[in-house]
From Swiss-Prot:
All copies of domain RCK N-terminal, residue ranges: 352-488, 781-921
Binding site for K(+) 1: V296, G297
Quaternary organization: Homotetramer; which constitutes the Na(+)-activated K(+) channel. Interacts with KCNT2; these heterodimer channels differ from the homomers in their unitary conductance, kinetic behavior, subcellular localization, and response to activation of protein kinase C. Interacts (via C-terminus) with FMR1; this interaction alters gating properties of KCNT1. Interacts with CRBN via its cytoplasmic C-terminus.
Name of the protein this chain belongs to: Potassium channel subfamily T member 1
Residues bound to K(+) 3: R761, K764, N769, Y771, Y777
UniProt key word Phosphoprotein: yes
Organism: Rattus norvegicus (Rat)
Positions annotated with a glycan in the UniProt record: N133, N137
Family, as annotated: Belongs to the potassium channel family. Calcium-activated (TC 1.A.1.3) subfamily. KCa4.1/KCNT1 sub-subfamily.
Cellular-component GO terms for this entry: plasma membrane; postsynaptic density membrane
Intramembrane segments: 282-302
Length: 1239
């Protein structure tokens, strides 16, 4: 119903407002208002308004007050109804076309029946006329047309053909009428209409002229009409089922029907024309057509008269024109389908399992990383990977996907995740998971994130039940995809990992090896022990199991977490790192000895393989004891053990579990309290040092005498190391200004009052202070310099882990941000609350900028990959500038530890490229061999990566892929990196082993020592070794080398203060555990070991000196050495001159020529080490051992990775009692060691 305003009639205009026209009915409602209008009432004013409205706008006749309007009346006509039924309606038109197709096939079948029933020998003539016989004379070229014009047609067959022709004719005329658009001639001269008239109109004429009933009518041409009807029917069918991707199917169908119609037309045409010639039957004509179309013909069957010969020529010409066009169209569609990838069928999606990978552009490195990591898990072998990418597949990807290993399991679809049609093609709603990756090589990374966000929204809208795994680049965009099941923010993880690299060396290597799937078989065929041990330990990964179902941990139910961790490692070689309560979703790393294990707990542990795939071989205790004694007498090294023995034979370590107290040595005033102090046994040195047992239940009196909450009070009573500097007050709290939404709150060391923005500038003084260089600040710890292009929000995550509350105040290193562009106020507002954080504008390729930011006073320099150089015209050239700049810095500052981020992991080989170094060439061959063996970690033996000096964020892509099987990996990684802080969860730190700590002997005894004294869980070792390499171009087996400890090469120079040439202890928690050295007389074992190392080194040196005669090669080496020394002196003078020019003091600069073994260790990244130490080409290498076997020998300068329990874990339960007990113990605690763990 609708209302319309009608003009007033003349009578209505004359009538008064209260009058009613004659003959009109009284209105049903007052004032004639529609019931749809709101009523107005309540007072005279409302009534007057209502009447005025009625008089002006609704003064209608009561009979016309409501008007019913009908819509789409144009479709109610007879023609429109017919058009709707025959053409517009999908289902009805499909039925009509199916009927028409069947009708055409029936006419062709009736023609074949007429040919089979026809017998020319019975006579030829019109219906009702006299018949005569005709015989063809093969010797004469003349023939009669009568056998061609007249055929024999039975009466019943004629009736059926007439009826079918009449129906077809009427249908054709009706469709012509319905589809008429103003041009009748275009429809009349259409090929389909002409064929219809040829095949139907003669039959209708024979009804009115009987003699023509035997007239030949080429009914077999209806096959082409049937083909046309079939095409229309398939189109209607696809439209009815809403199938849009049907072009390929249609083209194949058209090609097949065209071939069939050509053969059928040729067969029937030649058979009929040869009635006047050789009188061929249908089968012979069909054989002739097939032979003629497929070959040049055999000549056994040939047409006899010229009309049939002419027909053959015409058919061949048509075939040569039509078929190539059809094939061209088919090939084009096939190529397009190869590009787009076709469809993933619904049947496969329901019967098979598949995951979808959505990317902006697919590169070969990204593809292989995903496939290798995804299919590394045994239970994913039956999964299919459907790649949905808007760009065309490049040549390298196409070549890889043609390999049988991947072609059977990977399907590439070209399409957009924003289109529901493409998501339907990928069957996203049936997928097991959807991985959405950002394009990190884009110049505008924010735009790349925006595309990722839209893809995630589109997938969530289309398939809300499909698990989402999203990779995001910028941390400020993370909250847009918070709904995803798993999210990895690239910049968050990158900056946090680079920060931990400065205080826990090679954290990047540790995390990378943990998140890669490996069986620990890399390097096992290498002749070098470090490669075998490093490769085997790289197979350790994080696994989980319910404690009640575990053979590893079931026996420790009701015991403390620390007790279970130690004994599981001792017995099975597994490292228990954390757990999760059944009623709590939070994962806790090392919850401490107060945590009692329950059967419902989920345990997370590090091992070569998961427990379900492990076999247990239990041996008799006597054999274990004997083997343990033999292991003490002769150390064969962990590399002698097979891979499975790490699990099967972990109970072979002899541990002295006597219940003795561990007391710090009372030697020097610096005291030993911060290291693994050697306990004394009543003054007797005959007994082997013992370690206290790990208690089943925590003893509160024996645990951490002072937690880190007392750090504030410690600082108040601790005298300053430098009397000229005042003690700066820090507070613990949460940063007040987060630079982006979604950052995890972390308790940090903060300034009591925010620093003014002017004070954050390192190289410029202000009204608050006049410092203009790092020397003037007088920092006690070495600097950490970060070189970045812009101060993005991700850089905030570099600062937070280094200022976390669990870091000791005395271990905080000053942080200098060397930025190409000036930071905005929003970023400065976020960092102004942190202590000792400064910025400076400059570039890493400018020597003046490096000197002004205090690079000569820095221990660590982090070079972050620049966004503007992440994309290059030539692949893998994006890192060229970064690599060259880092090379230059290593030449200028050899003692500096530089961590470099690269865009492409394959470029890390240039970080230590030496063309004539045989050892580097051998490592390159080893990498190629591992890659051929299918290893996911082929790059692991590159020395810069093994040492943790180079990192690429693409290495962490596997973290997202591994989360499909291990949904806890992202959470554990963020806890290790300090990005998330869960109450009660521990944190990652490091401890350095010195010669005074070697009484521990083995890693298993160290595990017990740490668990019993400070409840810390070691998870690995960072080891640095000195090697002497031969310069001869032999392989690794022929290389002459020795392995000694760094302490044998170290200069015995004393510490010269914070800016001295060599400090006794470096900055950061890495070196925070060792203090002054104890008397070597107390350690005869250490003296003997040092003498053995010295003799081995001297013997090796004397052998090489004796084998080096005065030859031309030796003279060349000497000249080269002199040349390099002069080069180093030149570089040293260059740096000093620039410092003088800038007005910087040169007293802190260390001469490049005076290299020590520590310098060599720090320069393992780049390899300018040949001929720099001595004539024996000494070099160093560093590597990470994850969860080594308990009988692994400790070496000096080993750095042990620890998971330390949260010092705030139990504060809420007994805060008052802890506060009083800590205050009572402050006087008894050594003030220099309170922040470290008492061991």
């Amino acid at each position: 119903m609708a209302r319309a305003k009608l003009p007033r009639s003349p009578s209505e205009g004359k009538a008064g407002p209260g009058d009613t026209p004659a003959g009109s009915a009284a209105p049903e409602e007052p004032h004639g208002l529609s019931p749809l209008l709101p009523t107005r009432g309540g007072g005279s004013v409302g009534s007057d308004v209502g009447q005025r409205l009625h008089v002006e706008d609704f003064s209608l006749d009561s009979s016309l007050s409501q008007v019913q309007v009908e819509f789409y009346v144009n479709e109610n006509t007879f023609k429109e109804r017919l058009k709707l039924f025959f053409i517009k309606n999908q289902r009805s038109s499909l039925r009509i076309r199916l009927f028409n197709f069947s009708l055409k096939l029936l006419t062709c079948l009736l023609y074949i029946v007429r040919v089979l029933l026809d017998n020319p020998d019975q006579g030829i003539g019109c219906w009702g006329c006299t018949k005569y016989n005709y015989t063809f004379n093969g010797s004469s070229s003349e023939f009669h047309w009568a056998p061609i014009l007249w055929v024999e047609r039975k009466m019943a067959l004629w009736v059926i053909q007439v009826i079918v022709a009449t129906i077809s004719f009427l249908e054709t005329m009706l469709l012509i009428y319905l589809s008429y658009k103003g041009n009748i001639w275009e429809q009349i001269f259409h090929v389909s209409f002409v064929l219809e008239m040829i095949n139907t109109l003669p039959f209708i004429i024979t009804v009115f002229w009987p003699p023509l009933r035997n007239l030949f009518i080429p009914v077999f041409l209806n096959c082409w009409l049937a083909k046309h009807a079939l095409e229309n029917m398939i189109n209607d069918f696809h439209r009815a089922i809403l199938r849009t991707q049907s072009a390929m199917f249609n083209q194949v169908l058209i090609l097949f029907c065209t071939l069939l119609c050509l053969v059928f037309t040729g067969t029937c045409g030649i058979q009929h024309l040869e009635r006047a010639g050789g009188n061929l039957n249908l089968l012979t004509s069909f054989y002739f057509c097939i032979v003629t179309f497929s070959t040049v013909g055999f000549g056994d069957v040939t047409p006899k008269i010229w009309p049939s010969q002419l027909l053959v020529v015409i058919l061949i010409c048509v075939t040569l024109v039509v078929l190539p066009l059809q094939f061209e169209e088919l090939v084009y569609l096939w190529m397009e389908r190869q590009k787009s990838g076709g469809n993933y069928s619904r049947h496969r999606a329901r019967t098979e399992k598949h995951v979808v990978l959505c990317v902006s552009s697919l590169k070969i490195d990204l593809l292989m990383d995903f496939l290798n990591e995804f299919y590394a898990h045994p239970r994913l072998q039956d999964y299919y990977v459907v790649i949905l990418c808007p760009s065309e597949m490049d040549v390298q990807v196409r070549r890889v996907l043609q390999i049988p290993l991947w072609s059977q399991r990977v399907i590439y679809l070209q399409g957009s995740a924003l289109k529901d049609q493409d998501l339907m093609r990928a069957k996203m709603d049936n997928g097991e998971a959807c991985f959405i990756l950002s394009s990190r090589n884009e110049v505008d990374r924010t735009a790349a994130d925006h595309q990722t966000i839209l893809r995630a929204w589109a997938v969530k809208d289309f398939a809300p039940n499909c698990p989402l795994y999203v990779q995001i680049l910028k941390p400020e965009n993370k909250f847009h995809v918070k709904f995803a099941d798993h999210v990895v923010c690239e910049e968050e993880c990158k900056y946090a990992m680079l920060a931990l690299n400065c205080i826990c060396p090679a954290t990047s290597t540790l995390i990378t090896l943990l998140v890669h799937t490996s069986r620990g078989q890399e390097g096992q065929e290498s002749p070098e022990q470090w490669q075998r041990m490093y490769g085997r330990c790289s197979g350790n990964e994080v696994y989980h199991i319910r404690m009640g179902d575990s053979k590893f941990f079931r026996e420790y139910e009701g015991k403390s977490f620390t007790y279970a961790a130690f004994h599981a490692h001792k017995k099975y070689g597994v490292c228990l790192i954390g757990l999760k309560r059944e009623e709590n979703k939070s994962i806790l790393l090392n919850p401490g000895p107060r945590h009692i294990l329950a059967a419902s707990d989920t345990c997370f542990y590090i091992n070569i393989t998961k427990e379900e795939n492990s076999a247990f071989i239990f041996k008799q205790e006597e054999k274990q004891k004997r083997r343990g004694l033999a292991g003490q007498a002769l150390y064969e090294g962990p590399s002698r053990l097979p891979v499975h023995s790490i699990i099967a034979s972990m109970g072979t370590v002899a541990m002295d579990l006597q219940n003795t107290d561990c007391r710090p040595s009372q030697g020097g005033s610096g005291g030993g309290g911060g290291k693994l102090t050697l306990p004394t046994e009543n003054g007797s040195g005959s007994r082997r040092p013992s370690i206290a047992p790990v208690l089943e239940l925590a003893d509160s009196s024996a645990l951490l005498p002072c937690d880190l909450l007392s750090d504030q009070s410690e600082d108040e009573v601790t005298p300053s190391d430098d009397e000229g500097l005042s003690v700066v007050e820090y507070v613990k709290g949460y940063p007040p200004n987060s630079p982006y939404i979604g950052s995890s709150p972390t308790l940090c060391h903060l300034l009591p009052v925010k620093a003014p923005f002017c004070c954050l500038r390192l190289d410029k003084g202000c009204k608050h202070n006049s410092y203009e260089d790092a020397k003037a600040y007088g920092f006690k710890n070495k600097l950490i310099i970060v070189s970045a292009e812009t101060a993005g929000n991700g850089l905030y995550n570099f600062i937070v882990p280094l200022r976390a509350y669990y870091r000791s105040r005395r271990e905080l290193n000053p942080i200098v941000l060397l930025l190409d562009n000036k930071p905005d106020h929003h970023f400065l507002e976020a960092i102004c609350c942190f202590p000792m954080v400064y910025y400076m504008e400059g570039s890493v390729d400018n020597l003046d900028s490096l000197l002004q930011c205090g690079i000569i006073y820095a221990d660590n320099l982090v070079v972050v990959d620049k966004e503007s150089t992440m994309s290059a015209e030539e692949d893998y050239m994006a890192d060229a500038k970064t690599i060259v700049n880092v090379q230059t810095m290593f030449r200028l500052f050899p003692s500096l530890s530089i961590t470099t981020e690269l865009t492409h992991p394959s470029n890390m080989r240039f970080m230590q490229f030496r063309a004539k170094d045989s050892y580097s060439l051998a490592l390159s061959k080893l990498e190629k061999q591992e890659r051929e063996n299918g290893s996911n970690l082929a790059f692991m033996f590159r020395l810069p990566f093994a040492a943790g000096r180079v990192f690429s964020i693409s290495m962490l892509d596997t973290l997202l892929y591994q989360s499909f099987v291990k949904d806890y990996m992202i959470t554990i990684t963020r806890l290790l990196l300090g990005l998330d802080t869960t109450p009660g969860s521990g944190y990652l730190c490091a401890m350095k082993v010195t010669e005074d700590d070697l009484w521990i002997r083995t890693y298993g005894r160290l595990f017990q020592k740490l668990c019993s004294s400070s409840a810390e869980i070691p998870i690995g070792i960072y080891r640095t070794e000195c090697h002497v390499f031969s310069s001869e171009p032999h392989d690794l087996r022929a290389q002459s080398q020795i392995s000694v400890n760094m302490e044998d090469c170290e200069d015995t120079r004393e510490a010269k203060g914070p800016w001295g040439t060599r400090a006794a202890s470096g900055g950061g928690s890495t070196h925070g555990r060792h203090g002054g050295s104890a008397d070597p007389v107390e350690h005869p074992l250490l003296r003997r070991k040092s003498l053995q190392w010295a003799r081995k080194l001297s013997r090796k040196s004397s052998k090489q000196a004796g084998k080096a005669p005065m030859t031309t090669d030796w003279i060349t080496q000497q000249r080269l050495s002199l040349y390099r020394r002069s080069e180093r002196q030149e570089l040293s003078e260059l740096v000093k001159n620039r410092m003088k020019h800038l007005g910087l003091p040169t007293t802190g600069y260390e001469d490049v020529a005076n290299l020590t073994a520590s310098d060599v260790m720090n320069r393992v990244n780049l390899g300018y080490l040949q001929d720099e130490m001595n004539d024996h080409h000494q070099n160093t290498l560093s590597y990470v051992l994850i969860n080594p076997p308990p009988d692994t020998r400790l070496e000096p300068n080993d750095i042990v990775y620890l998971i330390r329990s949260d010092p705030l874990a139990h504060v809420t339960s007994s805060s008052q009692s802890r506060k009083s007990s800590c205050s009572n113990k402050l006087s008894s605690c050594n003030p220099e060691t309170r922040d470290e763990t008492q061991l």
